[in-house]
Amino acid sequence: MNNLPRNSQFDSSSIINDLPLDLLDEILFRLEPKSMAMMRCTNNSIKSYLSDPRFGPEYPSWVRPSLFNLGSYGATYVCCHPLVSSCDYMSPGNGVELFDGSADCYIFGSCSGLLLLYIGCLFVANPLTKRFRILDHSGSKLIPMIVNGGLKGLSGISYPGGNVACTERAMCVGFAVNRNLTTKRFKIVGILEMENVYGFEINEGDSWRLSETSITTSSKSDLTTRMKPVYLDNTLHWLRNDGSIMSFNPETEQACLIPSIFHREPDTKLLFAESVKINRLTLISGTIETISVYTLVENHKWTLTRRIKNISIEEETLVYWNIAMYDGKCLVVRVKKMGLEPLASVLHVYDMEANSWGVLVSTLAWPNCVRDFYKLTPSLFFVEEDEQQKVLVASNDRRISYINSIMGLIDTTK
């Protein structure tokens, strides 16, 4: 029976305001991402409360991350899989096909729930809130060269090898979202490499500029090709072939060389990553028998912290395998065996706490077999836009439909 007076109105805002903050936090954090996004749009009290910057770094710990999967040399098909420790069945995940050959997709980074990607133009997008921002990339020295071919270094000399060599340098682009600022600013950093000299270009959302910072190293070692940078402690880190690391803080614009050394064995797969559980840089080195986890200790030494028995791989039936993703909680490897469908491979996931392997998903495997994987943990970070600097694109532009399709790939219902 309704005990409210006949003329009274139900005020959900007042009830929300009367809740203890710790209880309200728990209620909101346990909502599905899609439900939280809807509440933000329909309830002013919730919208105001969620504007608190702590919802940026804390909220992702309650929601399921996804794994984007696409070709490294410009993709016309993009896949996305829920990232879980194990599955009872294999599924192809979600995918979107980009039919326009001029709109190949490149993902340059994933950070704090935002994606930096190129589909005919440069986007920063939040797949959870379905908000995106278009950036003018024409002022960059790196990005136009990567997506169009003809990448040049500081010396102005083009890299040999055509478009493949250019797209392999996509790892020179770093994407950083500062979680500690109320404005939640993002920055794009390109590292410019020439011999043992490094420079940096920066975009803060509206324009590109060359940082006054440059660094000259005493040792000559190239950046590791196709090895994505790692953003940790507000600093971007790029791995070099000798195991040392070039670091750059986008806020202070300070750069340094971390003189760590790693002797890579022949025929090993390598992945540079972050362990979110211990907040450390990690190197994953694997053979078909064993996968080893190394942690950077005291900023100068790679120390073996764990060995994992690889999934059963018979060399006679193996077409290829590689390490796709690691975050300290799980490890993902991709395997293509003979006998599978011509365009099929399998992603296997190792639960670091349960010490067990499971099958994550069956996925497409293009003949060149070179794929990029990006973990995205949904968040409510804003994608702010300066109206004066806004890049205008027609609402019926095909690139807009593509970015909307890609943002729609993440599963926010499970």
Curated annotation (Swiss-Prot):
PANTHER family: BNACNNG10540D PROTEIN. This is Putative F-box/kelch-repeat protein At1g20940. It holds the Pfam family F-box. Signal peptide: none annotated. Residues 13-65 form the F-box domain. Keywords: Kelch repeat, Repeat, Ubl conjugation pathway. Pathway: Protein modification; protein ubiquitination. Probable component of an E3 ubiquitin ligase complex. Kelch repeats lie at residues 281-328, 331-378. Interacts with DEK3. GO terms for biological process: protein ubiquitination. InterPro entries: F-box-like_dom_sf (IPR036047), F-box_dom (IPR001810), SCF_F-box_component (IPR050796). The keyword Repeat applies. It comes from the Eukaryota. The keyword Repeat applies.
